[in-house]
């Protein structure tokens, strides 16, 4: 935004939140018809980039009938085994295999989006609350449908723990219902808040460091010390992007387990 001082000189101030703004990159205009619904935004562009990266990752895992896989193949296999073991542990029983492809797809998608957002001057898709909460609402609705399809009206037993005294039934049912409906927001909000907070911290500290090092030669030399700390924060943010994708899948598997086994 622009600010004027007393001498009518204009200054341009970059907001740290500008990196999360959705902008039109390509669109059609016509005086007779509104074509804005087919505009290509940075969100749409990074969606296509994410799909392209995921497709490329899967094509690169082709072992071409070799007995010993490449390092890239082994890394993908390690991710696959990690998510499979997590789903098997969380859901268990004989049905975990039905839901593993869904959980794995969510992990790869969120993991790829988070890593792409760590590229300088890129766009953080998972920082948008509307997008991630929409995904969490779809998961919540899907698990609820699975619960009613599997158990019918017995699904309501999920909101009443076994052995609850009669006097506590209204209170506990209210708490369980509130907790269950909160999943529609909490799952996505957790991811969005962590990604947004990390990116804001990096941008703000990076901007302060740039201004410090641009003052004079002394501050330029002194700026290398906080630069090491900022690089450490960037490495931590890389770890958070992976952890958040994994946490999403753990909670998703936990929600599936609750609806399948009613506990």
Swiss-Prot record:
InterPro entries in UniProt: ATP_synth_F0_asu (IPR000568), ATP_synth_F0_asu_AS (IPR023011), ATP_synth_F0_asu_bact/mt (IPR045083), F0_ATP_A_sf (IPR035908)
Annotated Pfam families: ATP-synt_A
Propeptide: 1-14
Record field: transmembrane: 35-57, 95-117, 129-151, 156-178, 191-213, 228-250
GO BP term (any one): proton motive force-driven ATP synthesis
Top-level taxonomic group: Eukaryota
Keywords: ATP synthesis, CF(0), Hydrogen ion transport, Ion transport, Membrane, Mitochondrion, Mitochondrion inner membrane, Transmembrane, Transmembrane helix, Transport
Subcellular location: Mitochondrion inner membrane
Gene3D superfamilies: ATP synthase, F0 complex, subunit A
GO terms under cellular component: mitochondrial inner membrane; proton-transporting ATP synthase complex
PANTHER family hit by this protein: ATP SYNTHASE SUBUNIT A
Function statement: Mitochondrial membrane ATP synthase (F(1)F(0) ATP synthase or Complex V) produces ATP from ADP in the presence of a proton gradient across the membrane which is generated by electron transport complexes of the respiratory chain. F-type ATPases consist of two structural domains, F(1) - containing the extramembraneous catalytic core and F(0) - containing the membrane proton channel, linked together by a central stalk and a peripheral stalk. During catalysis, ATP synthesis in the catalytic domain of F(1) is coupled via a rotary mechanism of the central stalk subunits to proton translocation.
Quaternary data: F-type ATPases have 2 components, CF(1) - the catalytic core - and CF(0) - the membrane proton channel. In yeast, the dimeric form of ATP synthase consists of 18 polypeptides: alpha, beta, gamma, delta, epsilon, 4 (B), 5 (OSCP), 6 (A), 8, 9 (C), d, E (Tim11), f, g, h, i, j and k.
Family stated for the protein in its record: Belongs to the ATPase A chain family.
UniProt cross-references to NCBIfam families, sorted A to Z: ATP_synt_6_or_A
Descriptive protein name: ATP synthase subunit a
């Amino acid at each position: 935004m622009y600010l004027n001082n007393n001498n009518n000189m204009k200054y341009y101030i970059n907001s740290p939140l500008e990196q999360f703004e959705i902008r039109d990159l390509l669109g059609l205009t016509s005086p007779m018809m509104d074509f804005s619904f087919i505009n290509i935004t940075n969100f749409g562009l990074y969606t296509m980039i994410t799909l392209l990266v995921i497709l490329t990752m899967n094509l690169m895992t082709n072992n071409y009938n070799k007995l010993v896989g490449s390092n890239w193949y082994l890394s993908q296999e390690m991710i696959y085994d990690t998510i499979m073991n997590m789903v098997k542990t969380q859901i268990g029983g004989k049905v975990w295999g039905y839901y593993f492809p869904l959980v794995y797809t969510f992990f790869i998608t969120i993991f790829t989006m988070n890593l792409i957002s760590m590229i300088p001057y890129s766009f953080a898709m998972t920082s948008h609350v509307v997008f991630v909460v929409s995904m969490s609402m779809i998961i919540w609705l899907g698990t609820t449908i699975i619960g009613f399809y599997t158990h019918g009206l017995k699904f309501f037993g999920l909101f009443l723990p076994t052995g609850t005294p009669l006097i506590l039934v209204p209170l506990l049912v209210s708490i369980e219902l509130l907790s269950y409906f909160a999943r529609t927001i909490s799952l996505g909000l957790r991811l969005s808040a962590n990604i947004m907070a990390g990116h804001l911290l990096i941008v703000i500290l990076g901007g302060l460091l740039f201004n410090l090092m641009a003052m004079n030669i002394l501050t330029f030399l002194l700026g290398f010390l906080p630069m090491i700390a900022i690089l450490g924060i960037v490495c931590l943010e890389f770890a958070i992007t992976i952890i958040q994708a994994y946490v999403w899948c753990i909670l998703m598997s936990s929600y599936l387990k609750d609806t399948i086994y009613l506990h």
